[in-house]
Amino acid sequence: MKKIIALAMLVLFVSAPVFAQKYASINAKRANIRTCAGTKCALKWHAWRYTPVIMVKTNEDKSWVLIKDFEGYSGWIRADLLSPKGGMSAKVDLNVRKDPSASADIVCTVAKGYPFKYLAKKGKWIQVSDEPEKAKDGVCKGWVYNAKLWGFFKQ
């Protein structure tokens, strides 16, 4: 009996960090992700609106947040550029479809890592929309099979 309790406690403590993860999404058209907490730190990459991230930790005054994306890349971002609203990223290059069906017409095709805003869910399909960098590019709005997306949404 003691072994069972000890094993249960071990599982609880080992898995606790998984339950404690906090998610956010980028809330700026384009955000700079840096090597450390500060505008003088080197730029690592850019993240786009709706990109979902895991918040790892903050600096002392909570003005910067260390984030990690779906591929495990990490960097620092100003806290005011994050939102608790959901976002999704394409886990692979994928087709966005007119209706929630693999046989539906393709509306647009996006590359791995492309960020989306969550709109709705129907079965195992997620309705998404983007915010193109240039208005002339048009909005990509449609349905994606949920296994091809990484992220979170608030219902």
Region roles according to the model:
Residues I4-V14:
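Sec-dependent N-terminal signal peptides
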Residues A16-A20:
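Sec/Tat signal peptide C-region and signal peptidase I cleavage site
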Residues Q21-N32, A37-G38, A42-W48, P52-E60, ...:
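Boundary regions of SH3-family modules and the immediately adjacent low-complexity/disordered segments
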Residues K57-K62, K121-K124:
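Short, charged beta-turn/beta-strand-edge "cap" motif at the junction between a beta-strand
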Residues F116-L119:
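Periplasmic peptidoglycan-binding/anchoring modules of Gram-negative envelope and division proteins
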